[in-house]
Amino acid sequence: MNREKLMKMANTVRTGGKGTVRRKKKAVHKTTTTDDKRLQSTLKRVGVNSIPAIEEVNIFKDDVVIQFINPKVQASIAANTWVVSGTPQTKKLQDILPQIISQLGPDNLDNLKKLAEQFQKQAPGAGDVPATIQEEDDDDDVPDLVVGETFETPATEEAPKAAAS
């Protein structure tokens, strides 16, 4: 194509200014405020009440803790619904454990012991050896292997005895 033809075509395709083609459909940007308004209206129908003076919420999931500092907490006990709003921070359980020990009551001491056992099992090196020993102790039906012996030798010795009887 000629350079002159390209220049003419470029002039017809303008991005703005007088005589440009308008968009037929307006782009709709969905914002989070509309979602929040819908959620709040649904929560009003459920009948949630705001719970004031909550400084911290920790949600435990696997080995991760989702922590909310100064959240907005709403609850509906009749609907078994709890809403925690705020900015979450994801932390490892090991990092947050020293802070929450003082908050745990006597009921949760058993849970704390279970968590400590899990950490010992997951610890590299020393934690792996006791776990394998426990697994070996659980297998009472399986005989232990002895160096130099196979299971075939006792089986071949017992076969002639059984045939002789």
Swiss-Prot record:
Where the record annotates domain NAC-A/B, the positions are 33-97
Q: Name one GO cellular component term.
A: mitochondrion
Q: Which InterPro entries has this protein been placed in?
A: BTF3, NAC_A/B_dom_sf, Nas_poly-pep-assoc_cplx_dom
Q: Which GO terms describe its molecular function?
A: mRNA binding
Record flagged with keyword Transcription: yes
Keyword Nucleotide-binding on entry: no
Locate the compositionally biased regions of type Acidic residues: 134-143
Assembly, in brief, is: Part of the nascent polypeptide-associated complex (NAC).
Its family remark reads:
Belongs to the NAC-beta family.
Name of this chain's protein? Nascent polypeptide-associated complex subunit beta
Q: Which organism is it from?
A: Arabidopsis thaliana
User: What's the source species' lineage?
Assistant: Eukaryota, Viridiplantae, Streptophyta, Embryophyta, Tracheophyta
